[in-house]
């Protein structure tokens, strides 16, 4: 069975992992990093993803960040005259992770388990599945991020324990309470805030820098796009620095200019000031945490371990707040940036059979129901119900001889329908004429293991049935998804073609350089005609490179290669000939010396004693 990869599709960074030799392993990207920035940039029709896109974000306005915050909405990114949905942008990130995994594994990857925040509603989950499909991935399972983290953390734990997973990522916050032991993972409760994450902590620093600079220089940097991008980078770096040190220097020379000349931003930010600026954000995480504890029926003292997930949990004030609430020192044995992807890989291993004896019981984060008379929200499935699940309830008509009923499907916790999230609407028609309250309409909700909802309505009198698989108002039709899949494949082909063209140009440049060097090395040792032929072929290739005509470059490169090969062969032949001549000359010299030795005569001598002479 082919490998199923586990993907943590994050707001700020994404990560991909796979089961290898019974263990979940993070797949590094070609840059050697274990996480990839969830950043997509467009430049002259070319798409850049990850580190390279993040690096040029300052100068390129066509850069998309934190797209996950818009999943399941009607938001569109207008780039170079084309509109992109959040699903399409996310698919570009997924394509990059898919291709990195394929390069690492040496085989095609077509299936994935993708994680989402536990508090994602149905339309956000559906949008994530659609993004996977556009990227050419069959999404085998959608897993809640805290649950995935618990899978990675608890796989080798045999003792029963209750854990609280506190997941503060780049753009979303979740908290889940699970009971685990001996391969059994049961989510007791989950809560969260889809509009809270590390980006918000960056923003309070950015707002502080703008206010301080305006106070000192009277200039509002918030209107300057390039200055804002530099501020964002500096704020993110300062936030990370303050997790390890108590103060950091923010230095942004030439941030802007006015009539008096260039202006520089120089400011020292202390950890205490940062904690003051972000205290309301830390407090916002505690509400859902208390809610999850209440829903699970547990007190803080009954929690055995607190597991921190997401890069933002490195912030000391966050760690202190959760420690004060639970009375437990947070567990530091997992990498908060990688643990979710590792858990997704474990779930993939469960699906392929590589991981055995693991039972995962997740819950639905929000209540589901329909609108009934007077605009009231009537819940059929309460939040924190274990999934998959199915629930039916019988309703009736509100007027005499009512021929049809509109089923308005909602998700949320508010009492009135208008205050909750609409998931979809459908109609059950052809109800036989009858007084109000007589027809019996059975409404059934089904939630699958991905947390995706199906609803059906049935007239028990006629057995007529109507059903709907929820796709949100922002959802994509099958036709739209198919078109986006084709566009994504075409773009992947275009990207591949563009890379091949760049490689061809580089090879051509290298060949021009090699030719010039070869001609110089040959000097006068080659016929003038051959030299001229090589020069002409070289100039032809240079012109093709300047004109940027790929077909001409390819043809001229092949022609020049043949000429250079012939010249190089000559160069080797000459070198061999010279070596032979040198050897031959040495041989002649040796013979001459031997001849001289033949004329030498050995003479006898006798030693004369001076005493004898006397």
Swiss-Prot record:
This is Chaperone protein DnaK. Keywords: ATP-binding, Chaperone, Nucleotide-binding, Phosphoprotein, Stress response. InterPro entries: ATPase_NBD (IPR043129), Chaperone_DnaK (IPR012725), Heat_shock_70_CS (IPR018181), HSP70_C_sf (IPR029048), HSP70_peptide-bd_sf (IPR029047), Hsp_70_fam (IPR013126). The gene is dnaK. PANTHER family: HEAT SHOCK PROTEIN 70KDA. Residues 599-614 have a biased composition (Acidic residues). Residues 574-614 are annotated as: Disordered. It comes from the Bacteria. Residues 574-583 have a biased composition (Low complexity). Induction: By stress conditions e.g. heat shock. Gene3D superfamilies: 1.20.1270.10, 3.30.420.40, Actin, Chain A, domain 4, Substrate Binding Domain Of DNAk, Chain A, domain 1. GO terms for molecular function: ATP binding; ATP-dependent protein folding chaperone; unfolded protein binding. Acts as a chaperone.
């Amino acid at each position: 069975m082919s490998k199923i990869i586990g993907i943590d599709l994050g707001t700020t960074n994404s990560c991909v992992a796979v089961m290898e030799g019974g263990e979940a392993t993070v797949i590094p990207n070609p840059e050697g990093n274990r996480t990839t920035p969830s950043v997509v940039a467009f430049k002259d029709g070319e798409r850049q993803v990850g580190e390279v896109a993040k690096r040029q974000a300052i100068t390129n306005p066509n850069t998309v960040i934190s797209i996950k915050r818009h999943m399941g909405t009607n938001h569109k990114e207008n780039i170079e005259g084309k509109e992109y949905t959040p699903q399409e942008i996310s698919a570009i990130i997924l394509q990059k992770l898919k291709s990195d995994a394929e390069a690492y594994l040496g085989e095609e990857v077509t299936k994935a388990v993708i994680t989402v925040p536990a508090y994602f509603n149905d339309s956000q989950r559906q949008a994530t599945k659609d993004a996977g499909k556009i990227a050419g991935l069959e999404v085998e399972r959608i897993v809640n991020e805290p649950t995935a983290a618990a899978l990675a953390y608890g796989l080798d734990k045999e003792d029963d324990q209750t854990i609280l997973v506190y997941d503060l990522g780049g753009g979303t916050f979740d908290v889940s309470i699970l009971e685990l032991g001996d391969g059994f993972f049961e989510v007791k409760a989950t809560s969260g805030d889809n509009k809270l994450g590390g980006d918000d902590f960056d923003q309070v620093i950015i707002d502080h820098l703008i206010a301080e600079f305006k106070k000192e220089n009277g200039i509002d940097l918030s209107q300057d796009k390039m200055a804002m991008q530099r501020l964002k980078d500096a704020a993110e770096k300062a936030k990370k620095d303050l997790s390890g040190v108590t103060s950091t220097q923010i230095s942004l020379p030439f941030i802007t200019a006015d009539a008096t000349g260039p202006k520089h931003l120089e400011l020292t930010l202390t950890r205490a000031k940062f904690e003051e600026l972000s205290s309301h954000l830390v407090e916002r995480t505690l509400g859902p945490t208390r809610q999850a504890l209440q829903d699970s029926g547990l007190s803080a003292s009954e929690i055995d371990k607190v597991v921190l997930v997401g890069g933002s949990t490195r912030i000391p004030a966050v760690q202190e707040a959760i420690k004060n609430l639970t009375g437990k020192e947070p567990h530091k044995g997992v990498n908060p940036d990688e643990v979710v992807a590792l858990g997704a890989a474990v779930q993939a291993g469960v699906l392929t059979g590589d991981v055995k004896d693991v039972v995962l019981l997740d819950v639905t984060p929000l209540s589901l129901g329909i609108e009934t008379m007077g605009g009231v929200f009537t819940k059929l499935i309460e939040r924190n119900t274990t999934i998959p699940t199915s629930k039916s309830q019988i309703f009736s008509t509100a007027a005499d001889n009512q021929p049809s009923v509109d089923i308005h499907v909602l998700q949320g916790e508010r009492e009135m329908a208008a205050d909750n999230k609409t998931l979809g609407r459908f109609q059950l028609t052809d109800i036989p004429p009858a007084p109000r309250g007589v027809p019996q309409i059975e409404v059934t909700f089904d939630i699958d293991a991905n947390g995706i909802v199906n609803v059906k309505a049935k007239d028990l009198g006629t057995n007529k049935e109507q059903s709907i698989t929820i796709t949100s108002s922002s959802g994509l039709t099958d036709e739209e998804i198919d078109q986006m899949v084709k566009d994504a494949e075409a773009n992947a082909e275009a990207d591949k073609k563009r890379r091949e063209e760049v490689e061809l140009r580089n090879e051509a440049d290298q060949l021009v350089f090699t030719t010039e060097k070869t001609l110089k090395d040959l000097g006068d040792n080659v016929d003038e005609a051959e030299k001229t032929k090589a020069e002409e072929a070289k100039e032809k290739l240079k012109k093709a490179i300047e004109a940027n005509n790929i077909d001409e470059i390819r043809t001229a490169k092949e022609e020049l290669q043949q000429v250079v090969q012939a010249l190089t062969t000559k160069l080797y032949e000459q070198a061999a000939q010279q070596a032979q001549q040198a050897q031959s000359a040495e041989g002649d010299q040796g013979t001459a010396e031997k001849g001289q030795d033949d004329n030498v005569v050995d003479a006898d001598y006798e030693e004369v004693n001076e005493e004898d002479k006397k």
